Amino acid sequence: MKVVNILEIADVNEALLNAGVPARVRLRDACGGQALWVEVSRGAVAEKDDAAVLAAAREVVGSYFAGRAKPVAFDDDGKSFRLA
């Protein structure tokens, strides 16, 4: 089973920052598995702009993990994701 490590979270968050996307990837890791999601920075954008920010974040996150042979699949909410 592929897993995401904390260094990858730091790297993907840096990639989001460098791309100008006001969002961060969050990781909750437990013995039952990992939960990953994108969190939009509330101070940076209005709630009505969440969809555009999430779309940009999905692009950056998808590209980052695909480059590491760890493609991701986003859930219907557009925020939560897992390794595919």
Locations of regions flagged by a protein language model:
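Short glycine-rich, basic-tinged beta-strand/loop micro-motifs
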Residues: 27-48, 76-80
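Short, solvent-exposed secondary-structure boundary motifs
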Residues: 12-19, 55-66
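N-terminal acidic leader/helix
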Residues: 1-30
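Charged low-complexity stretches with an acidic bias
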Residues: 59-84
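Acidic, low-complexity, intrinsically disordered interaction modules
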Residues: 41-61
